C-alpha cells in the first residue's frame, strides 16, 4: 500500500483508536449528483440477512463521474468519501476486506482497469476490489447483493441493465438524451416542452401543458420558454418538469397522456431487450427473474403510475418477472455485493487448498 498523493486524507488513521479486530467492507454508489459510501462489518452469510442491516457508517460527497468533473476530481471525491466512512466507523484501511465501487461513467473495461489500478495504490494488496457501473449497485439494492436479474433505472436518465447467474451481462438505453434516452425524466420533459412550442406555433394540438408549465416556470408566454430552456439546458433542470407532465395527464390532457404512454413503451422495450439478450425469462419465456425498479420516474403517483404501467407491459410477455422496489439505498447494495463476492472467493480459495 503506497502513500497516495492525497495522504493527508488518511491522517485520521494516526490520530484515532481503531478497532482493527473488526473486518469491514465498503460499498460506494457514485453518480453525477452525489457519492455515498457505506461501511459494514463482515457478516456470516445467512438467509435472510439481518434486519436492520448493521451499517457502521455512512458518508456523502459530491460528483464522482469522471465524465462530468474530470478524473482527478472524481478520484479525490471517491477517496475522501471512503476515508470519511472509515473514520466515522472507527476503522482504517487495514480493516477493509473488500470494496465495491459502483460509479456512473464506468462503461468500458478500460474504465474499470484505470480505477482498479488507482484503488490498488490506496488499499493493502489483500483487499478484494470490485469496480462496476452504478446500475449494478441499484440492482444489488433490490436483490440484496445477488448479481442476477434486471434493473430499470428511470430518473433524469434511464438505463436497463441485466445479469445472469453465470456472469453474462447486457444493457439497453443509457446513452444520454442526444442518442435517445426516451422514457427518462429528461425525455418526458423535453417532449412536453416540444409539445408546448408546437401548440404555440399551430403545428400541434392545444394542450394543458402550456398553461401549467408556464405557470410553474413563472413565464408569461411560450416565446419565453425558448430563452428559459437554452439559458441552462442541463438534464436535471429539464427533468424536474416531469411532475407537471404527470399532473396534466392525471387531469385528462391527451398530449400529456400520449407522452407518458410512449415513455412506458420505451422503458418496457429497454427491459425486454435486456431480458431477450440474456434469456432471463428461460426457454419458455415464463421463468422467474427479479426486475428491480429504481428512480423518480417510476415512483407511484395518484393515478398515473408509470412504474406500474411498465410492469403491466412486461408481464404480458414475461409473466415470471417480479417487480422489486428496493428497501435499501444503492450504496448498501454495493456493500452487500462486495460481501457476497468476497465470501465466494473465500470459499473458492478454501477448496483450492
Language-model-detected regions and their locations in the chain:
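ATP-binding/phosphotransfer module of carbohydrate and carboxylate kinases, centering on a glycine-rich
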Residues: 1-96, 120-123, 143-145, 149, ...
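Residues immediately flanking
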Residues: 30, 103, 135
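Short acidic, glycine/Ser/Thr-rich loop/turn "cap" segments at secondary-structure junctions
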Residues: 100, 173-176, 305
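Solvent-exposed beta-strand sheet faces enriched in polar/charged residues
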Residues: 102, 132, 292-294
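N-terminal loops that bind phosphate or other acidic moieties
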Residues: 102-106, 154, 251, 315
Amino acid at each position: 500500500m503506497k502513500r497516495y498523493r492525497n495522504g493527508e486524507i488518511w491522517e485520521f488513521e494516526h490520530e484515532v483508536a481503531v478497532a482493527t479486530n473488526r473486518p469491514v467492507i465498503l460499498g460506494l454508489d457514485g453518480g453525477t449528483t452525489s457519492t455515498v459510501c457505506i461501511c459494514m462489518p463482515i457478516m456470516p452469510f445467512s438467509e435472510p440477512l439481518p434486519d436492520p442491516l448493521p451499517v457502521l457508517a455512512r458518508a456523502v460527497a459530491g460528483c464522482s463521474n469522471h465524465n462530468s468533473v474530470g478524473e482527478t476530481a472524481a478520484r479525490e471525491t471517491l477517496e475522501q468519501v471512503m476515508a470519511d466512512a472509515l473514520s466515522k466507523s472507527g476503522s482504517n484501511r487495514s480493516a477493509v476486506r473488500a470494496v465495491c465501487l459502483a460509479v456512473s461513467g464506468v462503461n468500458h473495461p478500460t474504465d474499470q482497469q484505470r480505477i482498479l489500478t488507482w484503488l490498488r495504490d490506496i488499499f493493502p494488496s489483500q483487499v478484494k476490489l470490485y469496480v462496476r457501473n452504478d446500475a449494478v449497485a441499484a440492482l444489488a439494492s433490490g436483490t440484496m447483493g445477488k448479481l442476477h436479474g434486471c434493473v430499470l433505472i428511470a430518473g433524469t436518465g434511464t438505463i436497463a441493465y441485466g445479469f445472469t447467474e453465470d456472469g453474462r451481462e447486457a444493457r439497453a438505453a443509457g446513452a444520454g438524451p442526444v442518442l435517445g434516452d426516451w422514457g427518462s425524466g429528461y425525455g418526458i420533459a423535453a417532449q412536453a416542452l416540444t409539445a408546448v412550442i408546437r401548440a404555440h406555433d399551430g403545428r400541434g394540438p392545444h394542450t394543458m401543458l402550456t398553461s401549467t408549465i408556464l405557470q410553474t416556470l413563472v413565464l408569461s408566454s411560450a416565446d419565453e420558454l425558448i430563452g428559459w430552456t437554452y439559458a441552462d439546458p442541463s438534464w436535471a433542470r429539464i427533468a424536474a418538469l416531469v411532475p407537471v407532465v404527470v399532473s396534466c395527464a392525471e387531469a385528462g390532457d391527451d398530449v400529456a397522456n400520449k407522452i407518458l404512454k410512449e415513455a412506458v413503451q420505451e422503458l418496457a422495450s429497454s427491459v425486454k431487450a435486456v431480458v431477450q439478450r440474456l434469456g432471463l425469462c428461460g426457454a419458455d419465456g415464463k421463468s422467474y427473474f427479479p426486475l428491480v425498479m429504481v428512480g423518480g420516474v417510476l415512483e407511484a403517483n395518484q393515478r398515473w403510475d408509470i412504474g406500474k404501467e411498465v410492469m403491466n407491459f412486461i408481464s404480458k410477455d414475461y409473466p415470471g418477472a417480479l417487480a422489486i422496489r428496493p428497501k435499501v439505498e444503492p450504496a448498501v447494495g454495493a456493500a452487500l455485493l462486495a460481501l457476497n463476492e468476497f465470501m465466494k472467493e473465500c470459499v473458492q480459495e478454501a477448496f483450492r487448498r
